Amino acid sequence: GRIAGCLGLDNLIMFYDSNDIQLSTETKDVTTEDTAMKYRAWNWNVIEINGNDCEQIREALNAAKAENQRPTLIIGKCIMGKGARKDDNSSYEHNCKTHGAPLGGDAYKNTMLNLGADPENPFVIFDDVKELYAKRAEELKGIVAARVEEEKAWACANPEKAAQQAEWFSGAAPKVDWTAIKQKAGDATRNASAAVLGALAEQVPNMICASADLSNSDKTDGFLKKTHAFTS
């Protein structure tokens, strides 16, 4: 989360289902953390909504897509087991038991009936849902076709980059001249590692090396000295 905010990865959108329930207890029993404030401190765009409201979800997604400086966290305050009913038809909402176990017996039937479904035919697809999905499928086909044409045009205009990209995603091991690595007898292993990383930095352009504020100690800076820092 911190590195995404630091790098300003604005094409990253994350959902957080904040329902205050975990497997054995309510979350308030074990944490007082303010998740929204934490992510704002990490330079995230944070949007808080009613996670059970479809229109609010849609609006939040549109706002997240419009953000061009920061990643976005959409925190949806939700009701765990919304609409669920117990065997005696009392509410099963906000109950930890619904976190890790299926609804059984009459609880299953009561919940289906409460939500407007038929327990005898639970997998029926309503006509309006069929129509919605069919319409969206056609829209997505058009989006995919347009994207394919864009990628073809880019590949024609950038043949070298296209070939490089294809190689990177092919799954083939990169070609490395291991003879270029020079080691000193009796040298510390971290220094030996730095020599290897330096050679890889020069020969494997899509390689990323990370070290949590220790690069000059664990010698992962052997990689950095032959390339450049990955920053925003």
Identify the meaning behind each predicted range.
Residues 131, 135-232:
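Thiamine diphosphate
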Residues 1-134:
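Glycine-rich ThDP/TPP pyrophosphate-binding loop and its adjacent helix/strand module
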